[in-house]
Protein backbone atom coordinates (compact mmCIF):
# COMPACT_ATOMS: atom_id res chain seq x y z
CA UNK A 1 0.00 0.00 0.00
CA UNK A 2 1.11 3.54 -0.79
CA UNK A 3 0.42 5.88 2.12
CA UNK A 4 0.65 9.62 2.61
CA UNK A 5 2.02 10.70 5.98
CA UNK A 6 2.42 13.98 7.83
CA UNK A 7 3.59 14.76 11.34
CA UNK A 8 4.01 17.76 13.63
CA UNK A 9 5.69 17.98 17.01
CA UNK A 10 6.76 20.74 19.37
CA UNK A 11 8.37 20.86 22.78
CA UNK A 12 8.66 23.79 25.16
CA UNK A 13 9.62 21.78 28.24
CA UNK A 14 12.07 23.29 30.67
CA UNK A 15 14.25 20.19 30.46
CA UNK A 16 14.35 16.96 28.51
CA UNK A 17 14.15 14.53 31.45
CA UNK A 18 11.71 14.88 34.35
CA UNK A 19 10.49 18.37 33.37
CA UNK A 20 8.67 20.58 35.86
CA UNK A 21 7.34 23.22 33.46
CA UNK A 22 6.32 23.81 29.86
CA UNK A 23 4.43 21.68 27.38
CA UNK A 24 4.88 19.33 24.44
CA UNK A 25 2.59 17.90 21.79
CA UNK A 26 2.66 15.81 18.64
CA UNK A 27 0.21 15.12 15.83
CA UNK A 28 0.52 12.46 13.14
CA UNK A 29 -1.67 11.69 10.14
CA UNK A 30 -1.58 8.79 7.72
CA UNK A 31 -3.84 7.84 4.83
CA UNK A 32 -3.73 5.54 1.85
CA UNK A 33 -3.87 6.88 -1.68
CA UNK A 34 -7.46 6.97 -3.01
CA UNK A 35 -8.08 3.98 -5.23
CA UNK A 36 -5.87 1.67 -3.14
CA UNK A 37 -7.00 -1.84 -2.26
CA UNK A 38 -7.57 -0.55 1.30
CA UNK A 39 -8.68 3.06 1.75
CA UNK A 40 -8.25 4.32 5.30
CA UNK A 41 -6.77 7.10 7.40
CA UNK A 42 -5.36 7.31 10.92
CA UNK A 43 -4.74 10.36 13.12
CA UNK A 44 -3.09 10.46 16.55
CA UNK A 45 -2.58 13.39 18.94
CA UNK A 46 -0.49 13.36 22.14
CA UNK A 47 0.04 16.28 24.48
CA UNK A 48 1.24 17.09 27.97
CA UNK A 49 1.55 20.26 30.04
CA UNK A 50 3.21 20.99 33.39
CA UNK A 51 1.97 23.56 35.90
CA UNK A 52 4.25 24.40 38.86
CA UNK A 53 2.01 24.46 41.95
CA UNK A 54 4.70 25.31 44.50
CA UNK A 55 8.47 25.16 44.61
CA UNK A 56 8.26 21.40 45.18
CA UNK A 57 4.97 20.27 43.60
CA UNK A 58 4.05 20.20 39.89
CA UNK A 59 0.78 19.28 38.17
CA UNK A 60 1.10 17.31 34.94
CA UNK A 61 -1.84 16.82 32.55
CA UNK A 62 -1.56 14.36 29.66
CA UNK A 63 -3.85 13.28 26.83
CA UNK A 64 -3.57 10.80 23.99
CA UNK A 65 -6.30 10.70 21.34
CA UNK A 66 -6.55 8.62 18.20
CA UNK A 67 -9.03 7.88 15.43
CA UNK A 68 -8.95 5.63 12.41
CA UNK A 69 -11.55 5.57 9.66
CA UNK A 70 -12.20 4.36 6.13
CA UNK A 71 -13.36 5.90 2.88
CA UNK A 72 -14.15 4.81 -0.66
CA UNK A 73 -15.12 1.16 -0.89
CA UNK A 74 -13.41 0.05 2.33
CA UNK A 75 -15.83 -0.70 5.17
CA UNK A 76 -13.60 -2.04 7.96
CA UNK A 77 -10.58 -0.31 9.45
CA UNK A 78 -7.59 -2.70 9.21
CA UNK A 79 -6.83 -4.45 12.49
CA UNK A 80 -3.07 -3.97 12.16
CA UNK A 81 -3.55 -0.19 12.48
CA UNK A 82 -5.58 -0.43 15.69
CA UNK A 83 -4.81 1.59 18.80
CA UNK A 84 -4.17 -0.14 22.13
CA UNK A 85 -4.55 0.97 25.74
CA UNK A 86 -3.47 -0.16 29.18
CA UNK A 87 -0.19 -0.27 31.09
CA UNK A 88 2.62 2.17 31.84
CA UNK A 89 2.35 5.42 29.92
CA UNK A 90 -1.32 4.63 29.33
CA UNK A 91 -3.91 3.50 31.90
CA UNK A 92 -1.86 2.08 34.74
CA UNK A 93 -3.33 -0.69 36.86
CA UNK A 94 -4.26 -2.69 33.76
CA UNK A 95 -1.91 -4.98 31.86
CA UNK A 96 -0.19 -3.49 28.84
CA UNK A 97 -2.35 -3.24 25.70
CA UNK A 98 -5.20 -5.33 27.15
CA UNK A 99 -8.08 -2.84 27.38
CA UNK A 100 -10.89 -2.55 24.86
CA UNK A 101 -12.39 -4.94 22.30
CA UNK A 102 -11.45 -8.61 22.26
CA UNK A 103 -11.76 -11.54 19.90
CA UNK A 104 -15.02 -13.47 19.88
CA UNK A 105 -14.66 -16.84 21.56
CA UNK A 106 -15.13 -19.83 19.26
CA UNK A 107 -18.09 -22.13 20.08
CA UNK A 108 -15.52 -24.95 20.26
CA UNK A 109 -13.34 -23.07 22.75
CA UNK A 110 -15.40 -22.38 25.85
CA UNK A 111 -12.42 -22.19 28.20
CA UNK A 112 -9.98 -19.99 26.28
CA UNK A 113 -9.71 -16.30 27.08
CA UNK A 114 -10.54 -13.80 24.28
CA UNK A 115 -7.47 -11.84 23.13
CA UNK A 116 -7.26 -8.02 23.02
CA UNK A 117 -7.49 -6.68 19.46
CA UNK A 118 -7.45 -2.90 20.04
CA UNK A 119 -9.78 -0.49 18.30
CA UNK A 120 -10.03 2.43 15.90
CA UNK A 121 -10.71 5.02 18.62
CA UNK A 122 -8.32 5.85 21.47
CA UNK A 123 -9.18 8.12 24.41
CA UNK A 124 -6.73 8.56 27.30
CA UNK A 125 -5.97 11.18 29.90
CA UNK A 126 -3.95 11.52 33.09
CA UNK A 127 -3.53 13.98 35.93
CA UNK A 128 -0.45 13.71 38.13
CA UNK A 129 1.01 15.66 41.01
CA UNK A 130 4.80 15.33 40.86
CA UNK A 131 6.86 15.80 44.00
CA UNK A 132 10.42 15.15 45.21
CA UNK A 133 11.30 12.36 47.61
CA UNK A 134 12.88 13.38 50.92
CA UNK A 135 16.49 12.50 51.68
CA UNK A 136 17.35 12.24 47.97
CA UNK A 137 20.42 14.30 47.13
CA UNK A 138 19.91 14.67 43.35
CA UNK A 139 16.24 15.59 42.87
CA UNK A 140 16.74 16.02 39.12
CA UNK A 141 17.18 12.26 38.66
CA UNK A 142 14.33 10.96 40.84
CA UNK A 143 10.68 12.00 40.92
CA UNK A 144 7.55 10.59 42.53
CA UNK A 145 3.93 11.17 41.51
CA UNK A 146 0.36 10.61 42.64
CA UNK A 147 -1.83 10.03 39.60
CA UNK A 148 -5.28 9.37 38.20
CA UNK A 149 -5.53 7.72 34.76
CA UNK A 150 -8.55 7.27 32.50
CA UNK A 151 -9.02 5.79 29.05
CA UNK A 152 -9.86 2.91 26.75
CA UNK A 153 -9.97 1.93 23.09
CA UNK A 154 -13.18 1.40 21.15
CA UNK A 155 -14.46 0.01 17.85
CA UNK A 156 -17.06 2.13 16.06
CA UNK A 157 -17.79 -0.62 13.52
CA UNK A 158 -18.52 -3.67 15.67
CA UNK A 159 -19.52 -6.82 13.74
CA UNK A 160 -22.95 -8.21 14.65
CA UNK A 161 -21.42 -11.53 15.74
CA UNK A 162 -18.91 -9.90 18.10
CA UNK A 163 -19.54 -10.43 21.81
CA UNK A 164 -16.51 -8.54 23.17
CA UNK A 165 -16.61 -5.41 21.02
CA UNK A 166 -16.79 -2.01 22.71
CA UNK A 167 -18.56 0.78 20.84
CA UNK A 168 -17.66 4.34 21.81
CA UNK A 169 -19.18 5.00 25.23
CA UNK A 170 -18.21 7.20 28.17
CA UNK A 171 -19.41 4.45 30.48
CA UNK A 172 -16.72 2.09 29.16
CA UNK A 173 -13.80 4.29 30.18
CA UNK A 174 -11.50 2.65 32.72
CA UNK A 175 -10.04 4.56 35.66
CA UNK A 176 -7.14 3.97 38.01
CA UNK A 177 -5.22 5.83 40.70
CA UNK A 178 -1.91 5.26 42.39
CA UNK A 179 1.66 6.35 42.95
CA UNK A 180 4.74 6.08 40.76
CA UNK A 181 8.48 6.69 40.89
CA UNK A 182 10.75 7.47 37.95
CA UNK A 183 14.51 7.19 38.37
CA UNK A 184 17.03 8.37 35.77
CA UNK A 185 19.93 5.93 35.97
CA UNK A 186 23.17 5.87 34.01
CA UNK A 187 21.77 2.95 32.03
CA UNK A 188 18.20 4.04 31.29
CA UNK A 189 15.15 5.60 32.97
CA UNK A 190 13.34 3.16 35.27
CA UNK A 191 9.70 3.63 36.28
CA UNK A 192 7.64 1.83 38.92
CA UNK A 193 3.94 2.22 39.61
CA UNK A 194 1.44 0.88 42.11
CA UNK A 195 -2.05 1.45 40.72
CA UNK A 196 -5.57 0.50 41.74
CA UNK A 197 -8.06 0.01 38.87
CA UNK A 198 -11.22 1.18 40.58
CA UNK A 199 -13.84 0.27 37.95
CA UNK A 200 -12.46 -3.02 36.71
CA UNK A 201 -14.96 -5.12 34.71
CA UNK A 202 -15.18 -8.85 34.13
CA UNK A 203 -12.51 -9.84 31.64
CA UNK A 204 -10.21 -6.89 32.36
CA UNK A 205 -6.63 -7.87 33.13
CA UNK A 206 -5.47 -5.83 36.11
CA UNK A 207 -1.89 -5.44 37.30
CA UNK A 208 -1.34 -3.55 40.56
CA UNK A 209 2.48 -3.34 40.42
CA UNK A 210 4.05 -2.30 37.12
CA UNK A 211 7.60 -1.71 35.97
CA UNK A 212 9.04 -0.23 32.79
CA UNK A 213 12.49 0.51 31.47
CA UNK A 214 13.17 3.47 29.20
CA UNK A 215 10.14 5.77 29.68
CA UNK A 216 10.05 9.18 31.35
CA UNK A 217 7.29 11.82 31.50
Could you describe each region identified by the protein language model?
Residues 1-142, 146-166, 203, 211-216:
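C-terminal outer-membrane beta-barrel translocator/porin domains of Gram-negative envelope proteins
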Residues 139, 173-217:
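In a subset of proteins, long, contiguous C-terminal domains/tails are tracked
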Residues 159-180:
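A short alpha/beta connector and helix-capping loop motif
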Amino acid sequence: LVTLQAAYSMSALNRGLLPTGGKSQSLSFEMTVPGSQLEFFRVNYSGQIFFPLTRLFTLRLRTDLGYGGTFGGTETFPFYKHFYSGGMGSVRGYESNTLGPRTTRSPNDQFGEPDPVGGNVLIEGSAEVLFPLPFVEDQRSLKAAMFVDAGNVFNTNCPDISTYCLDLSEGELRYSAGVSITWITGFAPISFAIAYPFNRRDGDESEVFQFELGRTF
